[in-house]
Amino acid sequence: MTDRDFPVSSIEDPLRVLGKHFRSGDQSVFLKAVTFGPFPAGAFPDEGMAQLERIRNELGANAIRMYEIPTLEFLHECARIGLRVFITLPWSQHVDFLRGGGELAEADELLIETIERFRGHPALAGYFVANEIETTLVRWMGRRKVREQLERLIEVGRANDPDALFSYANYPSTEYLIPGNQDFLSFNIYLEQREDFAAYLNRLQNLAGNKPLLVSEFGVDARTHGELTQAEMLEWQVEETCLSGAAGTTIFSWTDLWQRGGQTIEDYDFGFMRRDGTPRPSLDVVRECWEPLSRTSDVVELAGGPKLSVIVCTYKGSATLVECLDSLTTLDYPDYEVLVVNDGSDDRVSEIVATYDSIREIKIDHVGLSAARNVGAKEAKGEVFVYTDDDCIAEADWLTWIAKQFLEDPELGCAGGPNIPPAPESEMQARIIAAPGGPSHVLISDTRAEHLPGCNMAVRREVFEEVGGFNPIFWAAGDDVDFCWRVLEAGYELGFHAAAFIWHHRRFTPRAYLKQQIGYGKAEAMLLPLHSKRFRGLGGAVWSGHVYTPQAPGGGFVYHGHFGYEPFQLIYPDSGSGLGGVVLHVLWWVCVVIAVVGGFFHWSGWLVAGLMLYTTFRVARKRAKRAPVEREYDGFAARWTLAGLIVAQGFLRSGVRLLRGWKYAKWSRGLEVVTTAAWKKVASGWWKLGYEKAFWSENGIGRDELLAGISAAYPEAQVDASGRTDLILKRCLLWNWALVTATEYHADNNRLTRTRLLARPRFLIRMIVLPVLLGVLVVAPFTPLLFTDAWKILLGVVSGYAALTAATRIFMKLRRPAILRIAEGLGMDPVE
């Protein structure tokens, strides 16, 4: 039998991802997984295959997670029993794997060999390309570089098996390390307070975006808490995982018998099975929790749930209406109605609605979206109005998650969830889906929103009436923004749940997309006089919360904490405005045109225009690179087309907004935004002069002991409050030395500690020197207009700057702190 002649399997369809769920065939799958191994040598001579029947039947699991590469026979047995297998790639990720490249080559080879062995196997669920890369090591290597390598590993895997699923098993200390191309978000979470666990799951759901969330590890030590408490905690863990809408959970572990790095672990008892093979009470408890679960919404209690009125307003939307109404007639909610407001009394819409006995049609003259929504509310019978669009498709449990929010908080004004675009059917559609400006929620916390798009927004009847419904001046867009702001001003909150998602088609052509963005620009101009305090100068709306987009993590600030040990290292995303927004604004293009015209009088104008254009397309290219394009349609052409859409979107939307709303724009505030963004860029800049050294210890001495020794030797040293580095050593009036360290843990008590000294100019110097340099760069093109020997002046400035930089480097190397002497005093040996 070849490795492709797989035996008969009780698993009929492979595991796939669709939205925030796992699917097998046309059925949603809630993953009920348990970790399996690695076992001490000789614990299970048959790889533990005799345990698989117990895992499937006694525990009720449908998947296992492994940390070693199994044999093909092992996967055959899993397929026969009905257990899917997640394989964690075991490679040397505990060291600086970016330095030599050997570890990455090892990982590539192992991944390709493993995929070649198991490609197409019915039991294969997916691969974890790495697991919990240590936080200070990630900081040392650089989070962007590490993320790029994880993404590269995933691409290597996909190139060899396009149908397999890939992810990185993350943990809270590197929360920011999220590969943009992974198929689902995975997190190992060990939070032992129910409220903390539930709150963190909500956060992870928002980080997951349009992808499923899998709890890739959760466990409770029975030795610490007792066996009954372990069972109780695992019970609420399963419940909270489901209530968050996560796609599955993995419990650590099947048995107390396990090892790490060749060492048998005997200090913890996480297993369902004791070391002697007898079960703990947690086995029966978890089985009873898992048994009735086929999807996450099964745990939601709907007793006393409100009557819901689903309102669809359509204006000549027959092209997508059938798909929308088909989904609305099969919703799994006990008490709801569906109303279609036919704005404009389109005959084709009436014909479609007439084929559904349970749907009411309301014909009206063409009055616009806001007025149509008000008509729907007037005719509705429900306690809650649930709005969606004619190009949306609802999941069966959509209303369950909407109702859950109102049941949990009787004072909630509105509720909603994400809107996710269906898979693209063409290259251009894939690019438009990745383009900016689509309808998106704005969150001020993980469960509270500042804005909910009208395609997925529910509102209580009494709140709707109190704020006066939708403002009829908005005919096509902007109505939901105005409505949400008025609800907030009335003192109500907007709820949000990541599982309450709907599918929402984006525009199908570039022309339709750009027309939509023009409409959004018009709507923003209409919002300006109504909510002037919520807009910044010449730009768009100012949000207190974060606008969620499917863009891969890129910018933003990470708080690493004291010596990089913060247990929950959050990423604080940038606003997406600042200088990046400036170079895409229509006024930037006005300046480009002025510079081009000036070029006809002197060549320096064309130079300025060229630099401005380069800056614009550099920003657009960077944003296009971070945008998630469906991999089937990704490539060079896709990224450059997307960059063009980004430039066009910024120009058209800001142009229409300014053209329609210039009377209400606060020009002084716009100038303030630009200058503030430029000032922050200068103030946060680092001049790095890296000086690296590594130290070896066979006595368990690592970075903690070294940092303590350095702190003692330099009493004036300060802990870096941001955690970007460990210590800031103030050695010079004009400069600071910053120290960052990381320790690699090798076999036995061996440690390799890496140190990096970074020279950083003091704040005053940065505020003086950098603006001067920027000024020189700006003025340089115009020197021919001012001086006859301009080239001599420019050459002198450049030469002086180069000489100053070289002298500074030599001086600072001579003045660097004596780390070597301190390390040797601790018994650490320098490594060349």
Question: Which ranges hold each PLM region?
Answer:
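Short aromatic/hydrophobic "clamp" motif used to bind/position activated sugar donors
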Residues: 385
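Aromatic-rich peripheral "rim/lid" segments of glycoside hydrolase catalytic domains that contact
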Residues: 252-303
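A conserved acidic beta->alpha catalytic loop
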Residues: 327, 342-350, 392
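Extracellular glycoside hydrolase catalytic/binding regions
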Residues: 139, 144-244, 271-273
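Short, acidic, metal-binding catalytic loop of nucleotide-sugar glycosyltransferases
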Residues: 326-335
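Conserved donor NDP-sugar-binding/catalytic core segment of glycosyltransferases
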Residues: 397-429, 493, 505
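Active-site mouth of glycoside hydrolases
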Residues: 16-17, 23-182
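Short, flexible, basic/aromatic active-site loop/helix in glycosyltransferases
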Residues: 417-418, 432-450, 465
